[in-house]
């Protein structure tokens, strides 16, 4: 039985209690119970019920059969040994629960056994030879348990020459175990015999006799021993071995090699400590430099002095020292801020592009800059006047951005974002023109009108083109009762900053709609291009005043 076909251990059978302590026996053994119903273990587990095992107590159980008190011992199924091995294995007698395993094992009549090892009863081949291992210090008996030649594997006792020859020919002695033709085996043995004869001429070798008849088994080349009567060779002594060793090189050669090596300059401990401290300081400054400072070369600052109100006096190139030349190539960081030089003082940032233009202004004073801005603004205003005004399809055109201003107004602020009506013109009236927003034309716009201290919010919702307002309302229910009208959905992104899902509508165009029906609020909002809604935001509750 191999380890791959091992079956799970089967627990000892449990009695089935039919009532009044009577146990039902069938076939000479107790009927097992279902282990997945009377215990808390899953159905795919083969463990017995610890609850049922604990009810027996001791080593047996007492029952009443025909009014007599009997003490019956638990027993395993009476099956033949072969059938018993088929459905239960002795490979394991332990269970998942240690306590239940001890109790169930104590009830069993069979002692606990070790797991059975797989027994391989393969028929031994008749041609297989058994070799006995012999050592050199054993007494030579002249006999062998091998079925082959008697002198094949007998080791010598104290013959160093024979031991040397055996170690020399020990590697090619074992041949392959698969079947080979008889002629091939004979030729290989002859070649081995010739090699041994050439290497060791004074030793006589004989080829094996039954090599062709013992194919397919472990083959060894026979090593003939010298006669026992031969005298062993004397072993070399320790003094002889020491005399045979080569002499070491003289001391003078080693000293000459040491003197020929050039003397390397050695750094003192003080110099090494100073160098390490300086390197650590520089590395720490480099790592801790500000990430907000520019990382370019110092030549980045050369063309920015023209924006200063009073340009500094630049030194001549020949007056610039080598230290400053090196400092200009270093990245801008905290390392070189201690250098005091006119070229490295604080700079003024260049002027930002005006009116959406990408050109850089190279003007020296503020008067020229103001004149340039005025000229650029006048050209833009003339271009807008030549264009046709947009069609007036609504009550009043209200857009996000104004692109023209009266001439008397300051030119320092090119873009003015306003949402209310244009201011009254001073002097000559200029028609107000509007452009589209940055993200295209918006169909609906929401504007915050007022914010109450109690948390209420007034929002003006205006249509920029025909269509719906873009938000939905629904009747809210709080604690099972109607609570009012709430915003249930916002479909336009332009309304999301002012209108939020869950905001309660209190007023619509100064009309109190709290408690009104949903249809009434819809009729109030419908048919209008702009509506003012007073909301109670759902984010926070109004403060108690």
Swiss-Prot record:
SUPFAM superfamilies named in the record: PDZ domain-like
GO biological process: centrosome cycle
Chain intervals with Low complexity compositional bias: 109-128, 141-152
Comp. bias (Polar residues): 86-100, 212-221, 228-244
Region (Disordered) location: 1-162, 200-250
InterPro entries reported in the protein's UniProt record: PAR6_homolog, PDZ, PDZ_sf
All copies of domain PDZ, residue ranges: 458-540
Protein name: Uncharacterized protein C09G1.4
């Amino acid at each position: 039985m191999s380890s791959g076909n091992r079956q799970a251990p089967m627990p000892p059978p449990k009695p089935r209690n039919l009532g009044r302590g009577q146990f039902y026996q069938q076939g000479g053994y107790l009927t097992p119970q279902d282990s997945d119903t009377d215990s808390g273990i899953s159905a795919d587990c083969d463990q017995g019920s610890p609850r049922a095992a604990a009810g027996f107590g001791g080593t047996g159980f007492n029952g009443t059969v025909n009014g007599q008190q009997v003490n019956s011992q638990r027993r395993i199924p009476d099956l033949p040994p072969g059938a018993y091995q088929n459905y239960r294995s002795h490979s394991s007698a332990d269970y998942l629960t240690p306590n239940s395993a001890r109790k169930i094992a104590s009830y069993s009549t069979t002692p606990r056994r070790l797991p059975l090892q797989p027994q391989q009863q393969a028929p031994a081949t008749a041609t297989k030879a058994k070799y006995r291992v012999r050592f050199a210090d054993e007494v030579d008996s002249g006999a062998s348990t091998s079925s082959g030649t008697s002198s094949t594997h007998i080791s010598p006792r104290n013959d160093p020459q024979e031991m040397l020859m055996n170690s020399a020919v020990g590697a090619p002695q074992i041949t392959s175990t698969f079947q080979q033709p008889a002629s091939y085996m004979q030729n290989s043995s002859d070649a081995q015999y010739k090699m041994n004869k050439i290497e060791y001429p004074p030793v006589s070798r004989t080829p094996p006799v039954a090599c062709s008849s013992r194919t397919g088994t472990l083959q060894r080349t026979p090593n003939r021993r010298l006669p026992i009567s031969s005298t062993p060779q004397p072993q070399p002594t320790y003094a002889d071995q020491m005399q045979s060793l080569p002499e070491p090189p003289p001391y003078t050669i080693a000293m000459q090699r040491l003197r020929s090596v050039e003397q390397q300059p050695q750094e003192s401990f003080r110099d090494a400590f100073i160098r390490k401290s300086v390197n650590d300081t520089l590395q720490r400054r480099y790592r801790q430099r500000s990430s907000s400072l520019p990382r370019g070369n110092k030549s980045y600052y050369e063309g920015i002095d023209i924006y200063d109100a009073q340009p500094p006096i630049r030194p001549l190139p020949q007056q610039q020292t080598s230290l400053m030349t090196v400092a200009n190539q270093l990245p801008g960081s905290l390392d070189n801020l201690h250098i005091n030089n006119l070229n490295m003082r604080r700079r003024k940032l260049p002027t930002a592009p005006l009116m959406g233009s990408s050109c850089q202004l190279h003007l020296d004073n503020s008067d020229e800059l103001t004149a340039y801005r005025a000229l650029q603004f006048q050209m833009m205003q003339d271009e807008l006047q030549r264009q046709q005004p947009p069609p007036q399809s609504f009550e009043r055109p209200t857009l996000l951005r104004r692109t023209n201003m009266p001439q008397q107004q300051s030119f320092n602020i090119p873009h003015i974002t306003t949402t209310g009506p244009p201011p009254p013109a001073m002097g000559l009236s200029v028609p107000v023109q509007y452009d589209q927003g940055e993200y295209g034309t918006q169909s609906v716009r929401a504007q915050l009108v007022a914010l109450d201290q109690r948390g209420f919010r007034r929002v003006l919702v205006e249509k920029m083109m025909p269509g719906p307002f873009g938000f939905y309302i629904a009747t809210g229910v709080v604690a099972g009762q109607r609570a009012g009208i709430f915003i249930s959905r916002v479909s336009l992104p332009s309304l999301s900053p002012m209108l939020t899902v869950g905001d309660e509508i209190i007023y619509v165009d100064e009309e109190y709609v709290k408690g009104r029906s949903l249809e009434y609020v819809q009729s109030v909002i419908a048919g209008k291009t702009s509506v003012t809604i007073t909301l109670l935001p759902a984010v926070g509750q109004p403060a108690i005043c």
